[in-house]
Amino acid sequence: MEGRWIGRWHSDYNQHNGVLRCLLMKKEGSTYFTRFHAKYKWGLLTISYPYDMDMTITQNGAKYEFTGEADLGKLAGGVYQYNGTGTTNRIDINYRADKDHGTFKLERPEDSE
């Protein structure tokens, strides 16, 4: 599961969406350092929002299960909970906060991405 991932995020709450990049690095056991870098358009502006968190990733056969939590600060919506599933080629994560919820869809990038 370690390495680079790329895809999109989508808010089911307000329909915001954009490009999402992710880097997963194993720390120890089932804990992975996770760096997300989300982008979205707000009018003519492109907003870039990077953040880090630890995720728990456990393997169940050929599938992986993801859980985590991150406090993105009051302006970004507060505390977000994450859970999802994946394979070595695709990750689908649901996220939820008090005033937002949606999905992350990630795949392995092409070498040029």
Predicted regions located by residue number:
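Central antiparallel beta-sheet cores of small beta-barrel/beta-sandwich binding domains
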Residues: M1-E113
